[in-house]
């Protein structure tokens, strides 16, 4: 297999980890593992011997695919997608696009297995933590994806730069959860992201569906035990009141289905399972603490 080490995909950086997983979602022949040592980096290999960069360039999504995704903000014949999504709108999209290749874009963003009834007269589908609300023109997650996708006009060159760790950043908010776009509280400069990484990270979400236990969130019931939970979000053992994202690095070269199986089997708080699965490192989320009315969100990491 043709193998490529990617300094631009450090496993400790959540968006880079998601991007690496997203590559396997876009390229069925792609295999992913992580280097050993204190700072694991992505290792990409193709089962058919193709150069990983050229294979990914060939599979880069078209503008039509992005525009016609089931999660698209506006689609003919459907109610518009808004950040606080009415349950009826979610169900309309889920039913219409059942079996669609990108139906995961709905199930990794919203769920009807936990609903929000905290606002009188409206029932909302639970929303992923990866689709944080954003004010004004930033809009819902598909609008953010579309904007950042538009910055990728030379896929081969830009993919190469991203994997090498030398990508040129652009002034954009990206998907809205990359901690590296946040500087300091005193810095009100424009946020910047790597557009290739953000697009790939979105496809990485295809392996992280959001689910629930058929419960309701009301003004009287807000328990973390009953909340919707996305794959890899675990109840925090430190306080038992919030969920934290936890993700692994592994040594075996795995395709999308293999990664899917590993994420099902991995128990981050039971280190006895790590070696059996080839997992040699893991991280948990540390979220940006905003102040006042600051709408900024971001997810960083600390080693498990």
Say what each PLM segment does.
Residues 177-193:
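Amphipathic interfacial helices
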Residues 164-178:
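Active-site-adjacent bridging/hinge elements
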Residues 168-170, 187, 240:
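A generic structural signal for short, non-catalytic loop/turn and secondary-structure boundary residues
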Residues 2-11, 21, 163, 189-192, ...:
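Elongated scaffolding segments in large macromolecular assemblies
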Residues 1-161, 177, 181-182, 201, ...:
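Conserved small-residue
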Residues 158-159, 175-176, 225-229:
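Short amphipathic alpha-helical surface micro-motifs
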């Amino acid at each position: 297999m043709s193998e490529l080490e990617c300094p631009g995909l450090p496993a400790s950086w959540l968006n880079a980890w998601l991007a690496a997983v997203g590559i396997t979602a876009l390229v069925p022949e792609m295999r992913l593992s992580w280097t050993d040592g204190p700072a694991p980096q992505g290792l990409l290999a193709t089962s058919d011997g193709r150069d990983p960069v050229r294979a990914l360039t060939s599979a880069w999504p078209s503008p039509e695919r992005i525009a016609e995704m089931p999660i698209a903000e506006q689609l003919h014949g459907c109610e518009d997608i808004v950040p606080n999504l009415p349950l009826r709108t979610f169900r309309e999209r889920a039913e219409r696009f059942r079996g669609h290749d990108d139906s995961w874009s709905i199930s990794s963003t919203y769920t009807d297995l936990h609903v929000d009834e905290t606002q009188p007269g409206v029932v909302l589908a639970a929303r992923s933590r990866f689709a944080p609300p954003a004010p004004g023109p930033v809009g819902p997650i598909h609008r953010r994806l579309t904007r950042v996708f538009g910055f990728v006009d030379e896929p081969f060159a830009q993919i190469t730069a991203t994997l090498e760790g030398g990508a040129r950043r652009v002034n954009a908010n990206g998907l809205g959860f990359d901690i590296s776009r946040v500087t300091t509280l005193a810095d009100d400069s424009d946020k910047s992201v790597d557009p290739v990484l953000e697009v790939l990270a979105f496809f990485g979400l295809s392996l992280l569906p959001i689910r629930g236990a058929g419960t309701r969130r009301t003004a009287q019931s807000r328990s973390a035990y009953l909340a919707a939970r996305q794959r890899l979000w675990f109840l925090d053992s430190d306080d038992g009141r919030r969920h934290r994202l936890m993700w692994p690095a592994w040594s075996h070269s795995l395709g999308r289905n293999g990664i899917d199986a590993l994420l099902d089997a991995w128990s981050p708080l039971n280190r006895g399972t790590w070696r059996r699965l080839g997992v040699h490192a893991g991280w948990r989320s540390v979220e940006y603490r905003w102040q006042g009315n600051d709408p900024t969100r971001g997810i960083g990491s600390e080693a498990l």
